[in-house]
Regions:
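C-terminal helix-coil-helix/basic helical segment that borders enzyme active sites and/or dimer interfaces
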Residues: 47-48, 313-346, 359-360
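N-terminal glycine-rich flavin-associated loop
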Residues: 103-123, 149-152, 287
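A short core secondary-structure module
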Residues: 171-215
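Short Gly/Pro-enriched turn/cap motifs at secondary-structure boundaries
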Residues: 147-149, 175-176, 223-229
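FAD-binding glycine-rich core of flavoenzymes that anchor FAD
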Residues: 116-146, 161-166
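Amphipathic, small/basic residue-rich leader segments at the start of a protein or domain
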Residues: 1-107, 127-134, 431-458, 462-518
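Glycine-rich beta->alpha junctions and the first turn(s) of the following alpha-helix
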Residues: 221-312, 381-386, 390, 399, ...
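Glycine-rich phosphate/cofactor-binding loops in nucleotide/flavin-utilizing enzymes
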Residues: 2-4, 10, 364-432, 440-443, ...
Length: 518
């Protein structure tokens, strides 16, 4: 598969109203891109900024002067009331320049502003949104605790209800924008009279500048990547007014899942801009770098690597399309864990894979924090860990598949997927790989392997659907070929029976030196 250059697509005929809205957004996004160009390339050198902890205040103020946070604030509160498509486009524009900046915007939008817009009490929305628009405030979300990361629903942060406020106590860590955000959505469980904690989780808005709501940063972490985002350990002993409790439609856990699934569906927006940057850097480098009398671009192995980057770009584009279809703030995403987990895992895996590919192509010069290739490795890696570690989510994808199959009393994978709306196009290419009966009692490692394969099958289906809707055909064809190969490899791994376990006290009788001869 040869590397393919992108061309501008034919413009669609829009209604006057849609054309006006599109022009308005184009003006907004172009201003944002221009602001990033000034902040990162004219006034400063982003490669040097990226090796420092945090962004200088003047740089952040310059970026925020373009009002990126206004996009997901509803119009009735002074914001732009942007669509999911527009929000993903904003995240992509930011991640092309800085993954940390894009994540900062994503934290603010998906983990604070959207939950407040959807679940916040009416009397507190306007003051909060006004401060975001006029004072460039920021917000984040605190869930994770020491010993309660993947097991977050058993969090120990608790609250008691008093006549005028909720008293929240606990410890939270690894919340992005620690010590920097002005507002936080806090998660806690209600403490009963006997001291036990209820199973449900409640969410509260904490105004870090208000009396009795100050969160104490106990320690700042030396995070490996994403230098511009502060992380740390936070001590909570705050009193939150009654009006600042988020109001669930059903339960707090379901509200939290709606929030997290919507956030996971924003990952491809962050991923697309980042992957495009990796692709563009790789093409430029390989065209300019000569080895053995010809440029790297002309070597077959390099073409394969560049084509894989282009495939990643195409898959992430398809995931953006699906997210824009599903993730509107008015939709309840709680039941869509299958879709959200696939979108999150695939996009984050492709981000890390793309960074690794670029570094391999660039070579030693890229193994530096002040080079986009090396920085891309450490900045993209945590996306596979936070908001659900990918191996756990892959297992959940398989568990969802098994549940779906049980519901219709089907044990053959191909027979089930050929009628599934998220797989029916792709499985026509894959019958020889999927025509088998599934053992519902498979070990956890096999759940993870199958989940990876299913996520790529759904990705192929989304790519094919995007092709039907007019996306560039040569990119579609190349990506389908790449995905077919990957799915074949994943299914081979899945079919291999292997249950090796760790050998404890392995050092006994395992020294090679004792076996060596002089």
């Amino acid at each position: 598969m040869q590397i393919t250059y992108s061309k501008s697509s034919d413009s669609l005929v829009l209604s006057p109203e849609k054309a006006s809205k599109q022009k308005s957004f184009e003006s907004f996004i172009n201003k944002f891109k221009s602001t990033l160009e000034t902040a990162f390339h004219q006034d400063n050198d982003i490669d040097q900024l990226s090796i420092q902890r945090g962004l200088p205040k003047e740089v952040l103020a310059k970026i925020m002067s373009a009002h990126p946070m206004s996009l997901c604030i509803p119009k009735e509160y002074g914001g732009r009331g942007g669509t999911v498509q527009e929000n993903l486009t904003l995240l992509s524009a930011a991640s092309y320049e800085s993954l940390a900046l894009s994540l900062t915007i994503g934290i603010n939008s998906a983990l604070f502003l959207q939950p407040v817009a959807k679940y916040g009490q009416e009397n507190v929305k306007m003051p909060i949104f006004k401060r975001f628009i006029e004072e460039q405030n920021m917000g984040g979300l605190m869930i994770t605790e020491p010993n309660y990361g993947s097991d977050a629903l058993n969090m120990q942060t608790s609250y008691v209800e008093e006549p005028d406020y909720y008293h929240i106590r606990g410890t939270k860590h690894w919340a992005g924008l620690t010590g920097q955000a002005d507002f936080w959505v806090l998660t806690a469980r209600k403490q009963t009279l006997n001291g036990n904690l209820q199973r449900d989780v409640d969410l509260f808005v904490c105004d870090n500048s208000a009396p009795f709501q100050k969160i104490v940063v106990d320690e700042y972490f030396e995070n490996l990547g994403l230098y511009q985002i502060p992380y740390g350990r936070n001590i909570l002993d705050v009193k939150i007014p009654k009006l600042q409790r988020l109001e669930p439609k059903t339960t707090g856990v379901q509200m939290l899942l709606d929030l997290l699934h919507r956030s996971r569906m924003q990952f491809p927006g962050i991923g697309l801009g980042f992957i495009k940057r990796m692709l563009d850097e790789a093409i430029t480098h390989t065209q300019q770098r000569y080895v053995g009398g010809k440029n790297l671009f002309s070597y077959d192995q390099v073409q394969e690597q560049l084509s894989s980057l282009q495939s990643n770009y195409t898959v992430c584009s398809a995931l953006c399309t699906k997210s824009s279809e599903l993730a509107d703030i008015h939709n309840d995403l709680m039941p869509l864990g299958f879709e959200a987990n696939i979108i999150k895992t695939v996009s984050s895996d492709l981000m890390q894979k793309s960074a690794q590919t670029l570094l391999q192509l660039v070579g030693a010069i890229g193994y530096k924090l002040n080079h986009i290739a090396g920085r891309g490795i450490v900045d993209s890696r945590p996306f596979q860990i936070f908001e659900g570690a990918n191996d756990i989510l892959y297992a959940q994808i398989s568990e969802s598949l098994i549940k779906f199959m049980k519901n219709v009393k089907e044990i053959n994978v191909w027979e089930f997927l050929k009628d599934h709306p998220l797989a029916q196009r792709a499985v026509e290419y894959l019958k020889e790989l999927l025509n088998f009966n599934l053992d519902y009692q498979m070990p956890q490692r096999k759940l993870v392997e199958l989940g990876k394969a299913v996520s790529r099958i759904v990705s192929m289906d989304l790519v094919l659907k995007m092709g039907e809707n007019g996306f560039r055909k040569d990119l579609i064809d190349g990506t389908v070929s790449m995905l077919h190969q990957e799915i074949s490899n994943l299914m081979t791994t899945f079919s291999f029976k292997q249950n090796t376990t760790v050998v404890e006290n392995y050092e006994a009788d395992s020294s090679w030196a004792n076996l060596a001869t002089s």
